[in-house]
Amino acid sequence: MSSVDKQNLTNRMRISVSHFAGASNANSIKKERKKKIFNVLLKVFKIIVYAFFLGIGLYGCFQNMANHWTINSTIVGNGFELGFHVDPILGANDIRFDLIYSGTGPWYPMSDFSFDYGPFYALFVWPIAQILLHFMYATRDWPAGLNAILGLIIILLIIRVITMLISARATIQTERISEIQGKIAEINAKYKDAKDMQSRQKKQMETKELYQKHNVKPLAPFESMIITLPIFLIIYRVVTILRPLKFISIFYIWDLSATPISEIFSNFTTSGWPYIFFLLIIIPVQILSQKIPQLLARKRNRNATTVGAKNKQQLKRVRMTQNIIAIVLAVVVAISASGIGLYWFFNAIFTILQSYIIHVIIMKRRSNSATRIESKLAKLGIS
């Protein structure tokens, strides 16, 4: 082969390589562009969903306070009530389920899907109430309110499945934030006395880089809180307006439509005193469901906790917030219908189990990761 042919072959190979590299770069640019577009669309979708849930939650909250027909009543056939239509064909022919007026006081029945009471009741309360209503009717002969207990557990599982991804993401993000608390404390200490704009920007940049490095989304833990508000209102309204629940007494002791604190003060010597035991069961379990995830997180991240403890003022604020939440939850359980307390009891048990399972999974992953690292070091002759 002559030198001219060799030169031509070399030039062709260079052109081919440059074309291949250009095509590869173009493909990578396209992929990166698609990824950016997908991330933007995902963020917009999340904002719309969370704004919707927050809006519907606030709407339901204000509606419950403002509209006269949302009045609660423990009296059968009174207040806002949801049940079956009174009809030989459509109805259940059972006074516990068919909507029949008591004859006194205001009464606002809801037997069919309708927007007459607003979108909150039509789109959220109605579907959940129908599941519980039909399940309780199918198991209406069960004794001691066992059908109501199992029905509430089914509702809890449905809601947990729907919100599983959000709650799991919030838990993982909280875990990641706990793991980098020590490094965050170091950044805060580094710029403790810095007041100029440049130093503040550097602090923000370092914190942002730390979050990106560990894939931390600081606002992710608050996502579950946005979903929690409408869910609480939905369950609250289902328990307080569902007609058959007004006939249920758990183990023939606790009336699900009654308010524990009212029963204790109004009928202590007769039916009120058992509600003390109701609160002594529900409230401690609810508090444990708040404390156990924190204790497990501390156990997983002892180093982060030790470093973070240097900032005693911040630690005090966190503990104070936790105590306030625990007190608020206890008060809400005491002043709400017993059905709410029962639902929260099962929810608390589920939260404790979920926290323990997540703890075991994380510890196993860390153990496996440490084993792999030790194996690689051993292969390199480092031990």
From Swiss-Prot:
Alphabetical list of InterPro entries matching this protein: YidC/ALB3/OXA1/COX18, YidC/Oxa/ALB_C, YidC_ALB_C
A Pfam family: 60KD_IMP
Transmembrane segments: 40-60, 118-138, 148-168, 222-242, 245-265, 268-288, 324-344, 345-365
Gene Ontology CC terms, in alphabetical order: plasma membrane
GO molecular function list: membrane insertase activity
Keyword set, alphabetical order: Cell membrane, Chaperone, Membrane, Protein transport, Transmembrane, Transmembrane helix, Transport
Signal peptide: none
Keyword Cell membrane (UniProt): yes
Topology term for the membrane: Multi-pass membrane protein
Subcellular location: Cell membrane
GO biological process, one term: protein insertion into membrane
Domain of life: Bacteria
Similarity comment text for this entry: Belongs to the OXA1/ALB3/YidC family. Type 1 subfamily.
Assembly information from the UniProt record: Interacts with the Sec translocase complex via SecD. Specifically interacts with transmembrane segments of nascent integral membrane proteins during membrane integration.
Function: Required for the insertion and/or proper folding and/or complex formation of integral membrane proteins into the membrane. Involved in integration of membrane proteins that insert both dependently and independently of the Sec translocase complex, as well as at least some lipoproteins. Aids folding of multispanning membrane proteins.
Name this protein carries in UniProt: Membrane protein insertase YidC
Organism encoding this protein: Ureaplasma parvum serovar 3 (strain ATCC 700970)
